[in-house]
Regions:
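Mid-domain alpha/beta scaffold segments of enzyme catalytic cores
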Residues: 1-252
Length: 252
């Protein structure tokens, strides 16, 4: 059984129900739907309440930091009490797109880390072109951390491993000349997750199509090859890691 540890069910070409059904048929036993703003997180909590094997997170993407208010933080705190919410995120820093100033992103990130510490929920981290600052801020985190859509070579892997952080590998790890792919054997297998980030980052061999949770099988197959283990072994390993991180009621 596989777990798609990071996806966006409300942005897919098909309904969440259809996406989950297709994923189950492909061998994906659970899906983590990730929130990117308050409204998205509320809808995610509603999905988790009605769809089997779907769990959600509550968070505000750094792209949305420019409009972030104290009321949003209060809303996230309330959502964190919902039974289907298993983590806080995605939150973090993104210096690539520039949708929000670094100052606004840092203020949101600091509040999110504090809220995670208060609620004891793990953090789902978005970091793009901001790894040093991201890691500096995470020094105050007292909860488990997953670096979603992890990108980086030996040095980044070493730092994540030293801190005991989980790393989520998405479809982009399958692309040609991926520095991250070369570093997979250096990663802590007990902190390894596979994800889609659907509808984005479709893995080979479906690159160019809109991504979906079912496609996590391709990323898992690639990662298994890099580690020199069987696909079933990789599936069990990463599903167990997802269960441990998010506290999922899965038999793995």
């Amino acid at each position: 059984m596989l777990v798609d540890s990071h996806t966006h069910l409300l942005r897919l070409e098909v309904s969440p129900e259809e996406a989950v059904r297709e994923a189950a048929e492909a061998g994906v036993g659970a899906v983590i739907n990730v929130g990117t703003d308050v409204e998205d997180s509320k809808r995610g909590a509603e999905l988790a309440a009605v769809l089997p094997n779907v769990y959600s997170t509550a968070g505000i993407h750094p792209h949305n930091a420019g409009s972030y208010t104290a009321a949003d933080l209060e809303a996230l705190a309330e959502l964190c009490e919902s039974p289907g919410i298993v983590a806080l995120g995605e939150v973090g820093l993104d210096y690539y797109r520039g949708y929000a100033t670094p100052e606004a992103q840092k203020a949101l990130f600091e509040d999110a880390i504090s809220l995670a510490n208060d609620t004891r929920l793990p953090l789902v981290i978005h970091s793009r072109e901001a790894f040093p600052d991201t890691m500096a801020f995470l020094g105050s985190a007292r909860v488990p951390v997953v670096l979603h859509c992890f990108e980086g070579g030996e040095r980044a892997v070493s730092e994540a491993r030293e801190r005991g952080y989980y790393v989520g590998l998405a479809g982009n790890v399958t692309y040609k000349n991926s520095e991250t792919a070369e570093a997979i054997p250096l990663m802590d297998p007990e902190r390894l997750l596979v994800e889609t980030d659907a509808p984005y980052l479709s893995p080979r061999p479906v690159r160019g199509e809109r991504n979906a949770p079912k496609n996590v099988v391709h990323t898992a197959r690639f990662v298994a090859g890099r580690l020199g283990v069987g696909e079933d072994e990789l599936a069990t390993l990463t599903a167990r890691n997802a269960r441990n991180l998010f506290g999922l009621p899965l038999e793995v």
